[in-house]
């Protein structure tokens, strides 16, 4: 099985990439393991997503226990309850596509080998899947 993350860490031409990771605190041992993205839609815009950063911490612990290197990132979530009844409602449905696209971009750009997606509402769940 191909390990995509090797594209960003293996070989002398990837020394600058490794330097970026090391600037974030990763070790050579961390870089030798598969990279698993841990994405959440946690934010302070909606109550169903506000707790997700804490769940992401637990997911990262699980990734570490499984022998991989977690890489956390977040994406948006729009609250229908707050966006309702004004111009903001036009943003709600499209937010699913933005969530999906932003996750795909992060995974592709950083060559993550796997993804744990954590979401909490009717738009962020399908966008994350």
Regions found by a protein language model. Give the residues of each.
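Metallocofactor- and cofactor-centric catalytic cores in central/energy metabolism, strongly enriched
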Residues: 1-129
């Amino acid at each position: 099985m191909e390990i995509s993350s090797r594209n960003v860490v293996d070989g002398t031409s990837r020394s600058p990439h490794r330097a970026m990771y090391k600037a974030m605190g990763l070790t050579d041992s961390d870089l030798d393991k598969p990279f698993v993205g841990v994405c959440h839609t946690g934010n302070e815009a909606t109550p169903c997503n506000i707790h997700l950063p804490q769940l992401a911490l637990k997911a990262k612990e699980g990734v570490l226990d499984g022998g991989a290197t977690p890489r956390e990132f977040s994406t948006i979530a729009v609250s229908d309850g707050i966006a309702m009844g004004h111009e903001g409602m036009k943003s709600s449905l499209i937010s699913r596509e933005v969530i999906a696209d932003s996750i795909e971009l992060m995974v592709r750009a950083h060559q993550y080998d796997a993804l744990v997606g954590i979401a909490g509402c009717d738009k962020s769940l399908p966008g994350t899947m």
